[in-house]
């Protein structure tokens, strides 16, 4: 069966997450106040932050009612995983109904990506995947940075930067908007996966080793604000389709902290505090929410054992009932959340 909000909360809790940001892509698209209000009735100690749709249906043709969505509980406004027309963005920014609420836009031009599956490189050609040119990120990024110059008071966030060129452009930008990076892009690249790995099927497209190194460096230097999970769970009916036609995305909240710890702490020499800044405090900043704090008698804590070994498989306890598009199946993982105060 497919994922629902309750199974999502359960998975996030057992993986140590106390907050979830949910994008407006749903059925129906979350561009009406009713869809915000109905989700706000869910009782959970995991804090749910709902993004409202920037445009109706995520189609980028007509603005949604920004004021109504934000007044009724939307944490901010986001569109689909590609850039809407600049004119509709200008229209929304000029109206300024979002005030200080965050706006999340993906610097991705799907017309330039076409059917590209992996960022254009030698490894992409060797794997036999259709290439995704770097211009599919760079050209919309140029547009968004130019727009941000004219509307610097807008709390703009760039959804999931994925290329070395993108990091370089942000580093050199006079005015820097906040930006996220997908966790999977920090732990894998298109030189490290087998041709049959489900981890190829992500948006934005997986890049090269140089892209991955630049993303890690960009995070460390605070060019990038936060790490996103961007979980997109699917069941067997979708997961078993050929990679070039299946729905893009992977799931696996339980993998995020162990694999990031391995890559950023063990291999890249980060301090634990830096990792926490990028997976907790940075996301709070982007969402315009208060940072998590450890307090006496609080249940908002987790215990993580970086040496705990376990086997990643779809039979893994607490993670077997829904999504089947988890990567790295049947492999040993080092590091595990062994307890969380939010687990009932």
Segment roles from a protein language model:
Residues 16-21, 46-49, 72-76, 147-156, ...:
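Short, surface-exposed connector motifs at secondary-structure boundaries
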Residues 2-9, 57-69:
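Short, acidic/polar
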Residues 126-153, 220, 226, 232-304:
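His/Asp/Glu-enriched, well-ordered alpha-helical/loop segment
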